[in-house]
């Protein structure tokens, strides 16, 4: 997330362009609620923050129930996140997701233990997460990494590597001649 943040409405336009179905994409709906709710945390206490908070909480619950996508406003999500297929996507409130990442259906970014409830994954830029993948704990996924379908990641993944299997094994890309 190295690029400057242009603001919630510019980010919404980027997110809409990034999803093939645009306004009809459930992934876009979830990101729209996130983009509109996250700036509320920076506001001072007051009636506007309270009313906006109630609206965004209701909208967030609607997205969770209707689309099966949970993106808490406390998570830090970079630009142009693409949610390829909706359903079963859970992101921990302390997670960090870099720019140009891709999440597929049934992905979990969560903590590993009740004793460390704030430990959450950090995804670098351009990370692709396959369907059904689970990334748990305070792990860092490097830039351009690929997490395979149904992989269970419990340790750091270096930049450009692939993590596949349960538990995930790390495979470095083969150098090209």
Mark where each language-model region is.
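Terminal amphipathic alpha-helical/low-complexity segments used for targeting or macromolecular assembly
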Residues: 1-67, 176-177
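Left-handed beta-helix
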Residues: 67, 72-73, 78-79, 84-93, ...
